[in-house]
Design a protein with these regions (language model features):
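Subset of Sec-pathway N-terminal targeting signals
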Residues: 1-25, 133
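Soluble non-transmembrane domains of integral membrane proteins
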Residues: 47-186
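Short, Gly/Pro- and small/polar-rich lid/capping loops
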Residues: 19-52
């Protein structure tokens, strides 16, 4: 009798855990399906609205395409190499890679992949992606493509945001995802 009660209690516990997991799964699915409404009081609210635009930099060996959404490189093509179809070798494009830099502020956090940057200071070898803040400050992602090289200098520079960042925070998070393509036959 006692053993049957223990077995029943065990089964009841398993069933209760399964029900809780099912409820949590449903709640997560509902939350994921709800539209995200940007915080209109955010210092970067205006930058959270926009449309994607592209800018290209190139030298003799490399062509890079930048997106203002996230202020990132969204396509890289090697000009001196060809793929199996004898086309210029594309290392990655928008479907293959994502990069987001995270910045921890005093009252809010910024994820670069959720923001629309303003493209400024464009030359044949440089571009600045600027994230404008409502207070007149900005966060710049500065890219410089070196001549005849595969090297890209990347600088993050903040201006007028001293009240946004806590003085003790000296780091940023990097979320970089890359899907490597098969480039060789076989």
């Amino acid at each position: 009798q006692e053993e049957m009660a223990r077995a029943q209690h065990y089964q009841d516990s398993i069933q209760a855990v399964a029900q809780k997991q099912e409820q949590m799964q449903k709640a997560q699915e509902i939350a994921a399906s709800l539209p995200v409404v940007p915080d209109s009081t955010s210092l970067f609210f205006q930058a959270s609205q926009g449309s994607e635009e592209f800018t290209t930099l190139e030298n003799d060996v490399l062509q890079l395409t930048f997106s203002n959404k996230g202020g990132r490189v969204c396509k890289a093509m090697l000009k001196e190499y060809n793929d199996q179809q004898q086309q210029p070798l594309v290392l990655f494009d928008g479907k293959d890679a994502s990069l987001s830099l995270g910045f921890e502020g005093k009252n809010e956090n910024i994820l670069s992949n959720q923001m629309y940057f303003q493209t400024t200071n464009v030359t044949d070898s440089t571009v600045t992606m600027r994230l404008n803040a409502a207070n007149g400050g900005h966060l710049d992602f500065i890219y410089k493509l070196l001549p005849n090289s595969y090297v890209v200098d990347f600088t993050v520079q903040a201006s007028g945001l001293q009240n946004f960042f806590s003085p003790s925070v000296k780091t940023m998070s990097v979320d970089w995802k890359q899907r490597a393509r098969q480039m060789e036959k076989g």
